[in-house]
Design a protein with these regions (language model features):
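The structured alpha-helical core of multi-pass membrane proteins
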Residues: 1-452
């Protein structure tokens, strides 16, 4: 990428040397006069001007891979300077040779450099695309941890960086979407409308979220945060307005993708909430369960049973089903709940909570940040070590509940098609045993049918 941006800078300098007067374009009065002279047509030109943001694509990286400082240093020392020089060079070329407007990038280079430049551009495209793909992986993982998407297989590609992940399902989806885009739009020019609308809306969302960060995390006053946000929104909304004219020319595509993703995420979130309410209907609390054990003690068998449940306030249905069918209970029962908090990381002192209800019944609540990975066997080893609750790995069985939804006419607050969509997402979700890295030979899954 250093070679790429250096090449852009050299190409720009070459053009500037042809027509040094292009540097006068840095004066904003030229832009103001242009808008005043051209009115609405001048405003719509912003939609084309906005495409200069494509130059920064190769710098893109989610903060799970690179920190704030490296990105700032790269931008101000290399990327920003190279892009400004290059766009000045293209402007100089168009002043000197207006007929070059159909392909100013390659015409800015010497003829002998055409094929090397095509090869370099291809490599830069691959690298820039890889950065975006990695960002999608990280965002998907965070959405899964926060409960907005079903569990998927997550492969860690680095032992040192927890943010470097690979998600096969997302990778295949991106591949098919990319092929469909190429076949459907046929050229990058036809994609300009889709790109402009997608990025301008993303910038507005980022600006609004920056206000929340400034208020809640940085402690800025409402006046200061609001003034900065409004200043950015003026420019963002201007670009969005110019790009709205391109909805019919490809701008519909990012809106369609956003609608599909939004529907999937909200359906999963709302469906899980309704399912949790169904599971809690008539459920026993740990205290009531222990009372029933004392009144009617079952046969106790050696070993430890770990029952995972998303709601720590009630007894998991899998435990009740196990007791009903086997007529026995392990001497030690651990009710394990894994919670993902809306922060990236949690301190060790906030991680674990262990409650002893008596009769060998314990509740372990484990909290993780959305950038952290839950490793249940490692967690239970830590519980044994720090909380003096012996959970020998070779003497522990994990019981998981697997719900099968029966779609009925019972009102749930969701449309029938969304109920069916949620049921399909449930069926195709990654197994909890694999997701939480449970040893396969020590897992028992108990199914339950639930009217939804």
């Amino acid at each position: 990428m250093l070679v790429w941006f250096s090449t852009l800078a050299l190409m720009g300098i070459r053009g500037i040397l042809w027509q040094p007067s292009v540097l006068f374009a840095i004066n904003p009065m030229h832009a103001i006069r242009f808008f005043m002279a051209n009115g609405m047509q001048g405003f719509l030109v912003l939609g084309a001007v906005f495409l200069v943001t494509t130059g920064g694509e190769a710098l893109y990286a989610d903060l799970g891979h690179f920190g704030e400082k490296p990105i700032q240093v790269d931008w101000f020392s290399i990327v920003g300077i190279s892009l400004v020089l290059h766009y000045f060079g293209q402007g100089a070329l168009l002043i000197r040779q207006p007929s070059a407007a159909h392909n100013p990038f390659y015409l800015l280079a010497p003829k002998w450099a055409l094929y090397p430049l095509v090869a370099l551009s291809t490599m830069a495209t691959v690298i820039a695309s890889q950065a975006i793909i990695s960002g999608v992986f990280s965002l998907t993982r965070q959405a899964i941890q926060l409960g907005y998407l079903p569990r998927m297989e997550i492969v860690h590609t680095s032992r040192a960086e927890i943010g470097q992940v690979y998600i096969p399902t997302v990778n295949w989806a991106l591949m098919f979407a990319t092929i469909a885009l190429v076949i459907g739009f046929r050229s990058s020019t036809n994609l300009a409308g889709a790109y402009g609308l997608a990025v301008s809306m993303t910038m507005i969302i980022t600006t609004v979220l920056a206000y929340v960060v400034a208020r809640d995390l940085l402690g800025w006053s409402a006046l200061t945060a609001g003034a900065v946000t409004v200043a950015f929104l003026i420019g963002d909304l201007a670009f969005l307005g110019a790009n709205l004219a391109k909805i019919a020319d490809g701008g519909w595509f990012p809106l369609l993708v956003a609608a599909v993703v939004f529907t999937l995420m909200t359906t999963w979130r709302q469906g899980r909430r309704i399912l949790n309410l169904r599971l809690r209907e008539g459920a026993l609390t740990p205290e009531d369960f222990v009372k029933s054990l004392r009144g009617h003690p079952p046969v106790r068998v050696p070993g430890t049973a770990v029952f995972m449940h998303r709601s720590g306030g009630v007894i998991p249905p899998a435990l009740l089903h196990s007791l009903k069918h086997y007529k026995a209970l392990h001497k030690q029962v651990v009710l394990l709940t894994v919670l993902t908090e809306e922060v990236s990381h949690l301190g060790d002192d906030e991680r674990l909570q262990v409650d002893d209800f008596g009769e060998g019944i314990y509740r372990v609540t484990c909290r993780y940040g959305y950038m952290e990975e839950a490793d249940i066997p490692a967690l239970l080893e830590r519980v044994s070590r720090e909380r003096h609750l012996a959970i020998p790995p070779m003497d522990t069985t994990y019981f998981l509940g697997r719900e099968s939804l029966i779609i009925t006419s019972r009102p749930s607050g969701m449309a029938m098609w969304r109920e069916k969509l949620f049921a399909s997402m449930m069926r195709n979700a990654e197994s909890a045993a694999r997701f939480f890295r449970l040893p396969p030979n020590r897992v028992v899954e108990l199914g339950a049918q639930i009217e939804f």
